[in-house]
A protein has these predicted regions:
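Core nucleotide-handling region used for phosphoryl-transfer chemistry
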Residues: 1-184
Length: 184
C-alpha cells in the first residue's frame, strides 16, 4: 500500500472466487507423459502400504479408472517429458474428526491441476475445462467419489483494495450462510 501511495498509483480492484473450506488432507495424483502415475501427500510419495488417511488405498482400489485417466492424458494431452499434477482434498469419513464432512463418504475433491515439464515451467489449468476434456469429451469413466471444487457452490466477490471494508459485510454473510447450511 505504501509503494502505491508513494507512486500515486491506486490499489487494484480484484475479483475473487472462493470455495467452501473442506477439512481433510491434501492429496495429489501425478501422471507422467508415458501414462505411469503415483500418489502423493503434500510432502511425500504415498502408497497403500505407506499411506495418508487411506488416499493411496482408494486410488489403487480404483486402479482401472485411474489407468484410463492416465492413458487419456498421456496420449491426448501430455507432450514428451510433461507431467500433470492433480491436487485435491481427500476428505469425509474418518479423515478429520469433529467436522461436518465426517458424516459423508470419503471423497477426493480436485481444486488444482498443473501441467509442467520441470519446476520452472508450470501451467495451471482451469479444473472445469480439464473435467470436460477428460470425462466428457473422451468419455473416460470418472472414479467413484471423485468431485471437483466447482461441483459445489462457489462464491464471487470483488475487492477494491482502496476501500476493502466495502466487501466485509458480504464476506460475513457468505461465512454465516455456509456455517448455517454447508453446501457440500
Amino acid at each position: 500500500q505504501s509503494a502505491c501511495a508513494y507512486h500515486n498509483v491506486p490499489l487494484p480492484t480484484v475479483d475473487f472466487r472462493g470455495t467452501v473450506k473442506l477439512h481433510g488432507t491434501n492429496a495429489a495424483m501425478v501422471i507422467a507423459h508415458d501414462g505411469t502415475w503415483h500418489c502423493q501427500s503434500r510432502e511425500r510419495i504415498i502408497t497403500p502400504q505407506d499411506d495418508n488417511a487411506g488416499f493411496a488405498a482408494w486410488v489403487y482400489g480404483n486402479k482401472d479408472d485411474w489407468d484410463r485417466v492416465a492413458a487419456t492424458l498421456s496420449t491426448a494431452i501430455l507432450s514428451d517429458e510433461e507431467t500433470v499434477q492433480v491436487y485435491g482434498e481427500w476428505c469425509g469419513g474418518n479423515i478429520q474428526k469433529n467436522v461436518g464432512l465426517s458424516h459423508l463418504p470419503k471423497m477426493f475433491v480436485i481444486f488444482g491441476i498443473r501441467f509442467s515439464t520441470d519446476a520452472e515451467s508450470t501451467a495451471w489449468q482451469e479444473t472445469n475445462k480439464w473435467k470436460h476434456y477428460v470425462f466428457e469429451h473422451y468419455g473416460t469413466p470418472k472414479p467413484s467419489n471423485l468431485h471437483f471444487a466447482d461441483d459445489f457452490p462457489t462464491y464471487n466477490v470483488t475487492v477494491d483494495f482502496n476501500s476493502p471494508t466495502l466487501v466485509q459485510n458480504q464476506l460475513v454473510e457468505i461465512t454465516e450462510a455456509v456455517e448455517k447450511d454447508c453446501p457440500v
